[in-house]
């Protein structure tokens, strides 16, 4: 006699739980989508957000007879305005100058402006524009002593929530400065690739391949590291560590191994 009310009660509870679960799914799904979007855009150099980054390259081994280590700590600021994005980088370098000798100081200020094209897909970003380098170095060894101009082009593809990729190409040459210093002609290519692992964690690589056309030297590293993206308020934080190994090089003083670490902030 009492089995029917019990069965009805259980059926009612199951229905209520099902309705509650369905009501919560959109919110949970939206949260997951927001977190996924933040992670996929956290490494986009053309993201439409003001950004401030702290990057460091520690180089414990250089090619040739150089025995000292090198280091480059970089302050990087990016600011969109209209259809343009400005990115400025100021390094503080420690550079070997001989056996058991190094010089430390500010490096050259590097600024480029990228015009952002409408690709027709919000997941794809492309920008191209002029690059300017100013001789702000405080020591001869930490800069070129030259004013330089060039061109920069950037592409970033975030159409996949799991895998993002792209690249940065730059070329610059000197147009003035200290006449006693060597001329400059440098081409650089930076492929980047990121695989989302869930929970804000991701695998990454963003090595810079540098070709000094004036001195006929180059180094080509590959990188594989790990990072973590998390959000606090309106700021997206991104921390990472990426070992980079040089697979091809020509000339003395080229990095053989470097550890690239960073702390990025995007302000929304």
What are the residue ranges of the model-derived segments?
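Cleavable N-terminal export/targeting peptides
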Residues: 1-39
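Transmembrane beta-barrel domains of Gram-negative outer membranes and organellar outer membranes
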Residues: 25-268
